[in-house]
Amino acid sequence: MERIKELRNLMSQSRTREILTKTTVDHMAIIKKYTSGRQEKNPSLRMKWMMAMKYPITADKRITEMVPERNEQGQTLWSKMSDAGSDRVMVSPLAVTWWNRNGPMTSTVHYPKVYKTYFDKVERLKHGTFGPVHFRNQVKIRRRVDINPGHADLSAKEAQDVIMEVVFPNEVGARILTSESQLTITKEKKEELQDCKISPLMVAYMLERELVRKTRFLPVAGGTSSVYIEVLHLTQGTCWEQMYTPGGEVRNDDVDQSLIIAARNIVRRAAVSADPLASLLEMCHSTQIGGTRMMDILRQNPTEEQAVDICKAAMGLRISSSFSFGGFTFKRTSGSSIKREEEVLTGNLQTLKIRVHEGYEEFTMVGKRATAIIRKATRRLVQLIVSGRDEQSIAEAIIVAMVFSQEDCMIKAVRGDLNFVNRANQRLNPMHQLLRHFQKDAKVLFQNWGIEHIDNVMGMIGVLPDMTPSTEMSMRGIRVSKMGVDEYSSTERVVVSIDRFLRVRDQRGNVLLSPEEVSETQGTEKLTITYSSSMMWEINGPESVLVNTYQWIIRNWETVKIQWSQNPTMLYNKMEFEPFQSLVPKAIRGQYSGFVRTLFQQMRDVLGTFDTTQIIKLLPFAAAPPKQSRMQFSSLTVNVRGSGMRILVRGNSPVFNYNKTTKRLTILGKDAGTLIEDPDEGTSGVESAVLRGFLILGKEDRRYGPALSINELSNLAKGEKANVLIGQGDVVLVMKRKRDSSILTDSQTATKRIRMAIN
């Protein structure tokens, strides 16, 4: 207010007004500033001044033939004077208006296709909702953000090849289109842009916008997905923010979001399996996100998130050299340290072995809702400057920094025993033990930390153990700042190694990431994630495990059937039956398995007892390590829908229901697919129909290799012999007939011969 009064005062003196409005600008320094160099120093002024002239535009000479000298109002459209220094004509802005209204018309069909990104942006803005403007201090931190909504994720080189192929197909130069996305995009664009009259350079430029992710390092408070970044200038200023809901989503943001969810699910699941690294790779290879292979997305997508980076490390891709602890990304900005094992005692006199970092180091800490600068010496926090969205976020950052400092007072603040375990029931390492402990309750930690008097520093404020702000006192070495800490801007990637337990290390052996760092946050993916791996069946709960297990058996029935009769142990050990075991009550798993295996053995031994439906129904139970017992069961229990439900050994139940007439199998009322029983079940003599054109020679003969399924017989050449698995799970030797005429008689003789061959 004072300043405004002062200015008003000055302006009221007539001399001031005169100086400001009348004096010429003849100061040498000013003239120099505006005339030296080719760079325009004041583009908007230059534009206004140019447009005030009569002929500010130059055009090709041909314009004089295409545009009249005067328009209907008699205004001159172009000058007879040619432009100094070029053979172009000087043109009035009115000529542009005339051209737009009366110039030649061209087909507009390609415009929405070429300028797709612009048209889409207009649609998003049209349907977006702008809310109220709030005035408040904005804590902005610079983050690397995607500024180009709606792009594919090709590398610059891949995009260049696609653009050359689409826009300049006849140019020389080697172009290798290898990836699936490259080929699809090229084909699509070539069709769309047939007979396109828009200048090739413009098409190339617009294609680049569509194909490549462009990132900038920008100050952001709030949403970082590309549909928010495109309106950054409308939604946040230095002291204000405007609420905004985008009017549409773009695939690249959805891919980023879904990739993070898929990666988290996969890492969490892999961590609890017998061989985490092998499982993780198997799942990454067999997962699709929105119809694209996850492996392809990982190769192209620069998203940096703990789980995503673990997956990338497993694939041998480079990742950022920053490391993760407590959900914060740490980047060392100066100093160095050496690591040494040290034993420390907690407040509960429990011994912990920690790797102490000896030496002075400075780090930036960046999290979702808080950022900080941390300076530490050996087991001592020198200074922590933290900023965050709210008290809770600031507290989280302080806890992580205190644990990271490895200070003695932090370790002594532990009350009770530390025995936190990960998802696989293994003890966490000491640093994560401490972190979990204080994340649960940090009262003692803050209380014991110690407080100090503080100096009044602009933009900084103290924080007390109960998290209240103060200008006089603060926890030792800790200040809260109004300013955020920028994210690490470099896009440098380093070579890393990953061990069996998914711990990622840089080449100096520092651990950058581990499964403990993967967020437990659950979200709903924007794009469909298809996990083909049986390890992920349990992600949607017990029902999904049940349905998926039976669907898998039905899909692979032909091979399962052969294994069932010839190599049952291998079949029982298939990983696809692993998830199912969690549904079977632990105490009885072994007995069920022993019972089912015995039942199956009888089926193999006794002619005519083979029963497709029953084998499928009971097979998953045989996968557990069997306990030998004399127990017989008429029903088996599975834990779904929060309680035990029964599967009847003989007959249908709500869990497993097979309809003989429609051949449909329903699991818990959900359709699980069509089940074709073997033709011989229930009706003797039908094998012959299946074996038409084959002569049954006798019992199985191992020299002719493993048994084929009936479907595979069709590949035999005439006169070729093979073992074949017929209905009852029995194997006989057959030969494909040399002549087709005798096929009819096969039907009658086959039945007799099968009986003889088996008995």
Swiss-Prot record:
Its job: Plays an essential role in transcription initiation and cap-stealing mechanism, in which cellular capped pre-mRNAs are used to generate primers for viral transcription. Recognizes and binds the 7-methylguanosine-containing cap of the target pre-RNA which is subsequently cleaved after 10-13 nucleotides by the viral protein PA. Plays a role in the initiation of the viral genome replication and modulates the activity of the ribonucleoprotein (RNP) complex.
Motif position, Nuclear localization signal: 736-739
Places the protein is found: Virion; Host nucleus; Host mitochondrion
Keyword Hydrolase part of the UniProt annotation: no
Entry-linked InterPro entries: Flu_PB2_2nd (IPR049110), Flu_PB2_6th (IPR049114), Flu_PB2_C (IPR049115), Flu_PB2_CAP-bd (IPR048298), Flu_PB2_middle (IPR049111), Flu_PB2_N (IPR049106), INV_PB2 (IPR001591), PB2_helical (IPR049113)
Superkingdom per UniProt: Viruses
UniProtKB keywords: Cap snatching, Eukaryotic host gene expression shutoff by virus, Eukaryotic host transcription shutoff by virus, Host gene expression shutoff by virus, Host mitochondrion, Host nucleus, Host-virus interaction, Inhibition of host innate immune response by virus, Inhibition of host MAVS by virus, Inhibition of host RLR pathway by virus, Inhibition of host RNA polymerase II by virus, mRNA capping, mRNA processing, Viral immunoevasion, Viral transcription, Virion
GO terms for MF: RNA binding; RNA-directed RNA polymerase activity
Biological process per Gene Ontology, one example term: DNA-templated transcription
Subunit relationships: Influenza RNA polymerase is composed of three subunits: PB1, PB2 and PA. Interacts (via N-terminus) with PB1 (via C-terminus). Interacts with nucleoprotein NP (via N-terminus). Interacts (via N-terminus) with host MAVS (via N-terminus); this interaction inhibits host innate immune response.
Site annotation Mammalian adaptation: residues: 627
Pfam families assigned: Flu_PB2_1st, Flu_PB2_2nd, Flu_PB2_3rd, Flu_PB2_4th, Flu_PB2_5th, Flu_PB2_6th, Flu_PB2_7th
Family, similarity comment: Belongs to the influenza viruses PB2 family.
Name of the protein in question: Polymerase basic protein 2
GO cellular-component term (any): virion component
